[in-house]
Swiss-Prot record:
Keyword Secreted carried by entry: yes
Record GO terms (molecular function): toxin activity
Assigned protein family: Belongs to the cationic peptide 04 (cupiennin) family. 09 subfamily.
Descriptive protein name: Cupiennin-6d
Record keywords, A-Z: Amidation, Secreted, Toxin
Entry GO CC: extracellular region
Subcellular location: Secreted
Tissue: Expressed by the venom gland.
Modified residues (Serine amide): S21
Main localization, broad class: secreted
Length: 21
C-alpha cells in the first residue's frame, strides 16, 4: 500500500513538472 502511494506521488510530481513546462 505505502509503495503504491509513493509511486503515485512520483507520477504526480512528474506530471506536475510536465504541466509546468
Amino acid at each position: 500500500f505505502i509503495n503504491t502511494i509513493k509511486l503515485l506521488i512520483e507520477k504526480y510530481r512528474e506530471w506536475k513538472n510536465k504541466q509546468s513546462s
